[in-house]
């Protein structure tokens, strides 16, 4: 498995504004809480980007990421009511 990487400033922003962090995402991945992985629906604007749907604290979050040759780069964490409803 490739290592995960992310922007430290973005992680701090997520902690302060959304009360979630990339560390929590990684923990959820290792706990097999990934519900889906799919290509980003807008490949023109976000070429090569994929999205994790991950359950954290009974809520589904969307985590866009880019799979590089040496790492998986996590872009952001988006809470999703629609995905939460879909997986309940």
Q: What are the residue ranges of the model-derived segments?
A:
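Ribonuclease/tRNase effector modules and their secretory precursors
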Residues: 1-88
């Amino acid at each position: 498995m490739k290592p995960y990487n992310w922007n430290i400033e973005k992680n701090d922003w997520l902690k302060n504004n959304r009360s979630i962090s990339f560390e929590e995402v990684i923990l959820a991945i290792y706990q097999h809480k990934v519900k889906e992985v799919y290509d980003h629906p807008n490949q023109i604007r976000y070429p090569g980007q994929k999205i994790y749907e991950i359950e954290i604290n009974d809520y589904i979050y969307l985590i866009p990421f880019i799979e590089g040759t040496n790492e998986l780069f996590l872009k952001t964490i988006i809470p999703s009511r629609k995905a939460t409803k879909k997986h309940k």
